[in-house]
């Protein structure tokens, strides 16, 4: 008697736990940073004209933010954040003043179409690498 009740219970439990786990591989994906310009941890010879981030899926401009700061310093003003016209996965902000030599940190925050907020940071250098 015990053995005959045990098997269906195990099968039901395995299905209940296994199906959502399999589905989460496709349903629960979150957007992530694919690439940036400047690329993380690179040194540029001259000041960049723009900062861009490319994400793994389309993003909402509302609620998105991109900030630039000199390492250990105050934020540096950027032009208004926008999506690239032909690429809904790319956010761009133009650099309005030439950056001096040194290290910089880019912080970003955005939201996917399904409402998940994702954020990150990366650094780059202008001028000779240390």
Go through the PLM ranges and name each one.
Residues 1-12:
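Bacterial N-terminal signal peptides that target proteins for export
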Residues 104-106:
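A short tyrosine-centered beta-strand micro-motif
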Residues 96-101:
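Surface-exposed, short loops/turns at beta-strand junctions within beta-sandwich domains
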Residues 109-113:
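Beta-strand-rich extracellular modules
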Residues 50, 54-57, 115-130:
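Extended, polar beta-sheet/loop recognition surfaces of beta-rich domains
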Residues 22-34:
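Proline/serine/threonine-rich low-complexity linkers at boundaries of modular beta-sandwich domains
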Residues 42-46:
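Short, solvent-exposed loop/linker segments at the N-terminal edge
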Residues 51-79:
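Short, surface-exposed alpha-helix to beta-strand junction/turn motifs within ectodomains of secreted
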């Amino acid at each position: 008697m015990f053995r005959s009740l045990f098997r269906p219970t195990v099968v039901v439990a395995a299905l209940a736990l296994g199906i959502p786990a399999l589905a989460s591989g496709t349903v629960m994906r979150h957007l992530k940073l694919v690439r940036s310009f400047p690329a993380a941890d690179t040194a540029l010879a001259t000041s960049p004209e723009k900062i861009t981030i490319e994400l793994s899926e389309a993003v909402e401009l509302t609620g998105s933010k991109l900030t630039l700061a000199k390492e250990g310093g105050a934020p540096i003003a950027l032009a208004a954040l926008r999506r690239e016209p032909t690429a809904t996965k790319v956010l761009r902000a133009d650099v309005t003043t030439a950056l001096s030599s040194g290290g910089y940190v880019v912080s970003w925050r955005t939201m996917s179409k399904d409402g998940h907020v994702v954020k990150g940071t990366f650094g780059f250098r202008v001028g000779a690498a240390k």
